[in-house]
């Protein structure tokens, strides 16, 4: 043990030694090479790679183990056209029996429910109060509706999350018969498991590359989104059945029930039409068999619940009515929460693979069905926006961010597929932020569309009117035109003024008229990049004729860091101070300053030159303005004509001794001309022959023995 420790210390000491052949002789070039070659300042490429690596690590930590395993990556790499075999999706479902795919969302939802605690009895009374408000808006007048109790609370958060997360139901016996109540509880438990399987299917069906289209994934998304529309039709029928039962209880003499929305379609007809003429049923593809089986399982549970609601006998009195209302809200909340998962997951990232991306007709129909259902049943069922949902779910948004960042770093520019989606989103956000929606997309009373034509005709008309013109693919190292358009709009004052968060002088514009909806429309402002190639003081236009943004750029406020508080008096301009000449009376210094100024004038941009931030028109021209390639780093040559020749020994990386693949202290082979003869040096007395030779391999054992002997002699001399 002592010998092993002594040997390890000797090796650590030998690792820090400098070879003797570098100590003797004239080696003037070695320090420069060690300084500039050993400089560890990060490069822009290294910083971008580190940022993408951090995104990837954060994403991998948030994913289930199966999504990041090697076996899945190998099987996806063997596929063509960015497809995912359904057998791989089924393996993902089998590998996640405890629903790890939704653990972040479940944790955040449980924490939110814990912060707003509400007992079961109080929650049931609050749900009943909300139901009375809803019933007064959908049935004709003359119905004796109970008055709202004083001091009621808002149960929206618990209605949205509790039925899906809590294992126990609020209304455990909504039917008179105990056997029927037990069948109801078993059906709800089976429905929860079936909904989880569809959500797992959607979670694990993502391809490896979000920057390319995927035919199989587009077909599966169409099936899922069409299935969402079917869910909301079933939910409307369930609520209509409950309303009819409650109205008969409140007014037994009036046997006619005429709701404002009319009688919905029976669930059996809706389900049969979807299974026969749905997206996966009409294409004949074999890559949606497991998805169709999972959808059929869910529809079977919903059919059993519909039969219980239609034929089951309810308890009489007030408690029977309360249990009927609460159980209906619970079941519909579970289905509504499941539909929100599919829609919000599509908006968070899966929409990149959908047919026509965000203009997908099934996505439009699903969102339209959800919004119509929420408006008709208000204030019973709240809706979670996609940003709020993504902050709770975490994993899907992190995965798409890391995957798209890696592709952008690898290719230098977004792909054609990804860029077309970004342009579509930017164009539609500009349209909606400028004013109210067009007539064919406006909503009439009750959530129905006011424009004429079918849903497909509306989607095609909106797509034809608002789709941007096709643009050529951008070249590498180019500047997006969206930023230039934003600056052009800010400089010219065209269009609605956008707020500037960093400008304390600008006044906030008046709020634009927003459509009446339950969804939060995020009016994001494109980020402003720092100004580059700013002209010198002699080439700036008069400040009075420049817009506000140009005046701020001329003052250098976009280049220097923001200083909080008043600026010190008499501080010179940063850009002008850069070009000040020396205050020396020496002719040589003045001549050098004049030469530097003339060189800058030769290389300075002229008024006629195109700037990389030059604005372009909206007539379908080039979106990207090419930036000339410039080298960031120049090779530094520090040797002068009279300097000593460079040493032929070049340092290389080695994981152990920093000396390449050769033996200990043995330099690499000579690649240049032979070195000049070294000056003779006195031969020093050596303790052991051939222990430290200048050329040839070194004996590690001899070196260890030498160091041990020197250590012992040092102790004796003390």
UniProtKB/Swiss-Prot annotation:
**Pfam families found in the cross-reference section:** Herpes_UL46 (PF03387)
Q: How does it sit in the membrane?
A: Peripheral membrane protein
- Post-translational modification remark: Phosphorylated by host LCK. The phosphorylation seems to be lymphocyte-specific.
Give the consequence of mutating residue 510 to V.
In strain: Nonneuroinvasive mutant HF10
Region of interest (Disordered), residue spans: 433-510, 581-611
What keywords is this UniProt entry annotated with? Activator, Host cell membrane, Host cytoplasm, Host membrane, Host-virus interaction, Inhibition of host innate immune response by virus, Membrane, Phosphoprotein, Transcription, Transcription regulation, Viral immunoevasion, Virion, Virion tegument
Q: Report whether GTP-binding shows up as a keyword of the record.
A: no
Predominant location of this chain?
A: virion
List the InterPro entries: Herpes_UL46
- Which Gene Ontology BP annotations are present? regulation of DNA-templated transcription; symbiont-mediated suppression of host innate immune response
Annotated GO CC locations: host cell cytoplasm; host cell plasma membrane; membrane; viral tegument
UniProt feature, compositional bias: Basic and acidic residues:
455-467
Please indicate which superkingdom the organism of origin belongs to: Viruses
Q: What is the effect of changing residue 631 to W?
A: In strain: Nonneuroinvasive mutant HF10
Report the locations given in the UniProt record: Virion tegument; Host cytoplasm; Host cell membrane
Q: Which segments show compositional bias classed as Gly residues?
A: 444-454
Family per UniProt? Belongs to the herpesviridae HHV-1 VP11/12 protein family.
What does this chain do?
Plays a role in the activation of the host PI3K/AKT pathway to promote cell survival. Interacts with and activates host LCK and thereby recruits downstream partners SHC1, GRB2 and PI3KR1 in order to activate the PI3K pathway by phosphorylating host AKT on its activating residues. This mechanism is inhibited by the viral protein US3 that instead promotes incorporation of UL46 into virions. Plays a role in the inhibition of TMEM173/STING-mediated type I interferon production. Interacts with host DOK2 and induces its degradation.
- Complex and partners: Interacts with VP16. Interacts with host LCK, PIK3R1, SHC1 AND GRB2; these interactions promote the activation of the PI3K/AKT pathway. Interacts with host YWHAB. Interacts with ICP0; this interaction targets UL46 for degradation by the proteasome. Interacts (via N-terminus) with host TMEM173. Interacts (via C-terminus) with host TBK1. Interacts with host DOK2.
The molecule here is called Tegument protein UL46
């Amino acid at each position: 043990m002592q010998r092993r420790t002594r040997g390890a210390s000797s090796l650590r000491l030998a690792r820090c030694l400098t070879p003797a052949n570098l100590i003797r002789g004239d080696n003037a070039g070695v320090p420069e090479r060690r300084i500039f070659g050993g400089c560890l300042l990060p490069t822009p490429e290294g910083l971008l790679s580190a940022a993408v690596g951090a995104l990837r690590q954060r994403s991998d930590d948030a994913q289930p183990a199966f999504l990041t395993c090697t076996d899945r990556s190998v099987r996806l790499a063997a596929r063509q056209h960015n497809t995912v075999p359904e057998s791989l999706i089924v393996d993902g479902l089998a590998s996640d029996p405890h629903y790890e795919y939704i653990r972040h969302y479940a944790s955040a939802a449980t924490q939110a429910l814990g912060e707003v605690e509400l007992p079961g009895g109080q929650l049931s009374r609050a749900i009943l109060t909300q139901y009375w408000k809803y019933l007064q808006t959908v049935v004709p007048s003359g119905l004796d509706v109970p008055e709202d109790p004083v001091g009621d609370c808002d149960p929206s958060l618990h209605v949205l999350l509790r039925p899906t997360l809590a294992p126990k139901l609020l209304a455990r016996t909504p039917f008179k018969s105990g056997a029927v109540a037990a069948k109801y509880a078993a059906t709800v438990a089976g429905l929860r498991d079936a909904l989880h399987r569809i959500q797992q299917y959607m979670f694990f069906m993502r391809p490896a590359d979000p920057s390319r289209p995927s035919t199989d994934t587009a077909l599966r998304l169409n099936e899922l989104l069409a299935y969402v529309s079917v869910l909301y039709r079933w939910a409307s029928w369930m609520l209509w059945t409950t309303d009819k039962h409650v109205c008969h209880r409140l007014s037994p003499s009036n046997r006619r029930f005429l709701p404002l929305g009319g009688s919905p379609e029976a669930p059996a007809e809706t389900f049969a039409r979807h299974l026969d003429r749905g997206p996966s049923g009409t294409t004949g593809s074999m890559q949606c068999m497991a998805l169709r089986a999972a959808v059929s399982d869910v529809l079977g549970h919903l059919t059993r619940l519909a039969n219980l609601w239609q034929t089951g006998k309810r308890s009489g009195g007030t408690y029977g009515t309360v249990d009927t209302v609460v159980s209906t809200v619970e079941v519909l909340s579970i289905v509504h929460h499941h539909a929100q998962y599919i829609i919000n997951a599509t908006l968070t990232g899966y929409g990149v693979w959908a047919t026509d991306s965000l203009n997908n007709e099934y996505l439009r129909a699903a969102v339209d069905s959800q919004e119509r259902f929420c408006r008709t049943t208000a204030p019973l069922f709240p809706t979670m926006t996609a940003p709020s949902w993504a902050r709770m779910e975490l994993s899907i948004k992190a995965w798409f961010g890391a995957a798209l960042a890696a592709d952008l770093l690898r290719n230098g520019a977004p792909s054609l597929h990804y860029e077309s989606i970004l342009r579509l989103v930017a164009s539609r956000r500009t349209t909606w932020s400028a004013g109210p929606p067009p007539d064919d997309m406006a909503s009439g009373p009750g959530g129905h569309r006011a424009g004429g034509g079918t849903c497909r005709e509306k989607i095609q008309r909106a797509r034809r009117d608002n789709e941007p013109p096709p643009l050529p693919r951008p070249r590498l190292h180019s500047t997006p035109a969206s930023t230039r358009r934003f600056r052009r709009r800010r400089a010219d004052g065209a269009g609605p003024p956008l707020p500037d968060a960093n400008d304390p002088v600008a006044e906030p514009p008046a709020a634009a008229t927003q459509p009446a909806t339950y969804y939060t429309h995020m009016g994001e402002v494109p980020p402003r990049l720092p100004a580059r190639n700013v002209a010198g003081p002699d080439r700036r236009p008069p400040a009075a004729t420049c817009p506000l943004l140009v005046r701020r750029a001329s003052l250098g406020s976009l280049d220097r860091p923001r200083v909080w508080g008043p600026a010190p008096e008499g501080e010179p301009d940063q850009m002008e101070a850069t070009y000040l000449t020396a205050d020396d009376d020496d002719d040589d210094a003045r001549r050098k300053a004049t030469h530097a100024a003339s060189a800058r004038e030769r290389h300075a941009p002229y008024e006629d030159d195109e700037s990389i931030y030059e604005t372009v028109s909206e007539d379908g021209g080039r979106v990207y303005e090419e930036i000339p390639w410039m080298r960031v780093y120049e090779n530094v040559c520090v040797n002068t004509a009279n300097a000593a020749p460079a040493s032929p020994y070049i340092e290389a990386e080695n994981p152990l001794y920093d000396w390449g693949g050769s033996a200990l202290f043995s330099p690499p082979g000579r690649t240049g001309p032979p070195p000049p003869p070294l000056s003779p040096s006195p031969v020093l007395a050596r303790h052991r022959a051939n222990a430290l030779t200048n050329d040839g391999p070194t004996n590690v054992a001899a070196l260890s023995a030498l160091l041990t002997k020197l250590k012992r002699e040092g102790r004796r001399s003390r």
